Design a protein with these regions (language model features):
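Adenosine-phosphate binding glycine-rich loop
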Residues: 286-287, 292-334
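Short, structured coil segments at secondary-structure junctions
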Residues: 82, 114, 134-136, 195, ...
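Glycine-rich phosphate/diphosphate-binding loop of Rossmann-like nucleotide-binding domains
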Residues: 65-80, 162-248
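Rossmann-like adenosine-cofactor binding region
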Residues: 218-304
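Phosphate/diphosphate ligand-binding glycine-rich loop within oxidoreductases
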Residues: 53-161, 296-300
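Phosphate-coordination loops involved in phosphoryl transfer and adenosine-cofactor binding
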Residues: 54-60, 168-170, 286
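Positively charged, low-complexity intrinsically disordered leader regions
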Residues: 2-73
Length: 334
């Protein structure tokens, strides 16, 4: 018989209503589901370094066609903490049948016979989304192409919710030179807009947020603004005057002859420690800074690491619990 804690957890899972669903976009979750997942994660937080035998006998497969540290390890840890087991493929183009030109659809069909849930990362969004339709178990996107990274956004939203107790009314600057390829920035902007935050999207105009993303965001919340081509001084002044949170979704710098040019424009979005300190002293306000990680040299002053404004490492402590909540909400338990 379940003890009271497990009964509470089961009731929360049932209330979320996401059992046997895929998570491909943050928009697959309603606002209510997101907030209920936060509450479930909060309930599971005490076990993120121990173990609950809720999913004993259940298996997670993690298939990563691109490098990952935090996403893959936190999902595998989450499954283990819930009492389940994991099977992992981190170099499929070398060590799996994909190296023999097996289609992703066939691979997903096969792996779904072994697993109760799959976490997939793949560089081609269309190919990945098509492959999901062949799966006989639920699939979670660990990031597909440049479109979205829904579980990273879910983690960062949960971190803000833990910090402020709310999302509604927060003023969040999503900032990077390149918002075309910032998949977490897209997921985060969708969810923040839906949950009632004021969103500023700061980038270079030539790398602005894709039109289809902006169109979808503005259908949700027409209060989202795009800000282009600021200098480093203007960028930090904007943060000082407007931000509760600076959200850095990271970006992949190009290689070759474009690399040096990109480093120079990255410098315009450098978060200065002095800006954070000035807000603290003059406004008695903490402007929080968070980053999806991994970060690149030149994105922020590393003194922020030791300040009260730092949220990116704090988020790691929340990452297992929120992914425990998501996995449990999808698999369910008796």
């Amino acid at each position: 018989m379940m003890n009271t804690s497990l009964k509470t957890i089961k009731n929360m899972v049932d209330d979320i209503g996401f059992i046997n669903h895929n998570l491909i976009s943050i928009n697959d979750l309603s606002n209510k589901m997101i907030l209920e997942l936060f509450k479930l994660a909060n309930c599971l937080q005490p076990w993120y370094k121990s173990r609950l035998e809720i999913l004993s006998g259940k298996h997670m497969a993690t298939l990563f066609f691109q490098p990952s540290t935090r996403t893959r390890l936190s999902f595998e840890t989450a499954m283990t903490r819930l009492g389940g087991t994991t099977i992992s493929e981190t170099t499929p183009l070398i060590s799996s049948s994909a190296a023999k030109e097996e289609s992703l659809s066939d691979m997903i069909k096969v792996v779904s016979q072994y697993a109760n849930i799959i976490v997939l990362r793949h560089p081609n969004s269309d190919e990945a989304k098509n492959a999901v339709t062949y799966s006989d178990c639920p699939v979670i996107s660990g990031a597909f192409g440049h479109e979205e990274h829904p579980t990273q956004a879910l983690l960062d939203l949960y971190t803000l919710w833990q910090t402020y107790g709310k999302i509604e009314g927060l003023k969040v600057c999503i900032a990077t030179p390149d918002l075309i390829h910032a998949r977490t920035g897209h997921s985060m902007a969708y969810a923040l807009a839906r949950l009632g935050a004021k969103v500023y999207l700061l980038s270079k105009k030539e790398y602005r947020t894709p039109n289809f993303v902006m169109e979808n965001i503005r259908k949700i919340n027409n209060n989202t603004e795009e800000i282009f081509d600021l200098s480093q001084k203007q960028f930090n002044e904007f943060i000082y005057n407007n931000a509760d949170v600076v959200y850095l979704p990271g970006c992949s710098a190009p290689k070759g002859e474009d690399a040096e040019k990109f480093k120079q424009i990255m410098n315009d979005y450098f978060v200065q420690y002095e800006t954070i300190e000035k807000a603290n002293k003059e406004k008695n306000k903490i402007i929080y800074v968070t980053h999806t990680l991994p970060r690149r040299k030149g994105e922020m002053d590393l003194r922020i690491d030791k300040s009260s404004a730092e949220l990116y490492f704090k988020a790691i402590a929340y990452s297992v619990a929120i992914r425990m909540a998501l996995v449990l909400a999808i698999i369910g338990f008796e």
